[in-house]
């Protein structure tokens, strides 16, 4: 291997020293050391044998190194020796008649050496390594270094596959031009406080590539010789069962996906003229590039995986499609949009599979996982290329890339690779923003008086930057800002003024993300209140509408209906995805969604062209995406309601949970279909026996189990100036069928006043006249008391169809006429007694 480093120069000095010594007699078996000592350097010379067995070509390499190393410097021990030594292999031309030589140099001897300035080094360069010589291919055939099942071996067309048909560039919107920053925004370094205070569009960072710094990429599958490149970015997404690694450099990209459950895949992009070499026994010898399509005008893509057109057609098609991404325009936002599209389809497959949190990935979701990982790598590469070409990167671009990378990485790990909630995401982009532990007060804009909803969008953009550059332990200032965003959305929801457009959905997601995984008691209380309000906004009606929204997105994104330009996962985000409602997959909700499909003309027309089972399957998958398996998993629930999982008796133990309602510190209500093991349980009366409802109050780590009765008494009506008697209580509306319709928090005095007004309330959720006459309601107090709300407890009014009424009236008239005729006939057939008058006397 020819290395442009000082180690090669030192090795040349050692070679000159060895060349000046008397030549030793050649011969003898490999491993028999031949000493040639030097008083100054204590150098040993020996021969290393490569290959073994009569059927394998055996050859020797002349080695020079410190005294004593010859006893362990065998070919099988090279990887262990590299920790303490630098191995330099000098590969000379076969025609020169000179032998190859390997030098072992102690790393301590070159600690202070600087890299040699060798001009005209390619940005991407392959290093064939010790076994690059032609005679070593027979050794590789022993499968000592590579498992050839990772790549197709024959026939040739499975190795050099053609590109998949990519979307026409004419169908894509042209990339938006990069904003030219003003000189005033040029800073050498800034942190997130500056971005929050003045906006990310006002800052940019000058960037350049350090061409003296190089790294060597070693493929996970040991199928490609190490590639030297100039690094510019890196990301690692990993958990205990899978990992995705992204390495970005000047003109270079590598994306590898490894998993205990899925087939491996590595996607590489290099300049079209780069000489990337494969380690393989294909055709018995020679240097071949990795599998992939023909080179494009500027770059070439390689895909290393398992599968061909006969063994695994789905994997083969995935490899072809991933390879086609390399020739698309270098627009990082376009790649991110495509990644969101694939991530949505991946979430849909995972929701349809209904697997547990540690059951592994859904089979059909894996093919989308490869595509998402490739798109993330290309987005990081595209931004890097554009920034280096222009000499700067905008803070807005860094925020965009980092928040998309973090969001899509979590989805990729959970839904695509089957990871539990403890997955890790580590990234290093071309420029980083420092993240201080505390945010300055001036980082937040004041809320305009009387314009809370308008400021929600602006505050949501600030929380987006917090999400991009903060870890799971967001600063307290960010949590307070997030709590205010959710509170304003909740107030608008209670007034019936909230419209769920994309800006509101994005703001809600970033607020929930900033509140998740609290680190102390104050943060926990803020997070529980955020979740209570998300649960309240997830009414049965909203869940139905949100499921229909997801079905329409699937019809556009996955069904070929078009219209998915600029799509993001957060465009379909719903408060149900961050709520404690766990009943959205029940049959009643699925039927509600199916019955509401005709109201969406485009969706109804698309489903008409699908098989009969498509509608119920799509509805069930959409409701599954709304549940806890989407963007926030079971770990989120465990962090916000620890009292349900921390008891020594083994948790609360209820089956078929409907909802969790935190009401006080270390206390929660759990609505279930079955009797739990602990807590104070209320069984609601008048509910369908096949779909019962039980309300259990669970406090702390208590394992006591008891039963209580729902109180049916008239609630006091507090005056507008009285203390808030019902603040912190939760209003629950349900039906005799067992369906829970609303779970609403009474958070302040104004909400309490509207609740007390009953049928005169201006808040639709509290007005019984605006709901079915069959509705029932109860109030859950923070102290564990459950009271029936009498305003919703009136007798059920019978309803009759007009035809039934007219038929009943006609029947009554006929019956009355018949009875009258019979009575008259009976009266005429019975003789009547006649009276006699006195006889006159004549």
Swiss-Prot record:
Residues the record marks as carrying a glycan: 77, 112, 617, 666, 760, 783
Entry's Gene Ontology cellular component terms: host cell endosome membrane; host cell plasma membrane; membrane; viral envelope; virion membrane
Gene3D superfamilies reported for this sequence: 1.20.58.1340, 3.30.500.50, Herpesvirus glycoprotein H, C-terminal domain (2.60.40.3190)
Keyword Glycoprotein: yes
Keywords: Fusion of virus membrane with host cell membrane, Fusion of virus membrane with host membrane, Glycoprotein, Host cell membrane, Host endosome, Host membrane, Membrane, Sialic acid, Signal, Transmembrane, Transmembrane helix, Viral envelope protein, Viral penetration into host cytoplasm, Virion, Virus entry into host cell
Segments on the Intravirion face: 824-842
Signal peptide, first to last residue: 1-20
Family: Belongs to the herpesviridae glycoprotein H family.
Name assigned to this protein: Envelope glycoprotein H
Naturally occurring in which organism (per UniProt): Bovine herpesvirus 1.1 (strain Cooper)
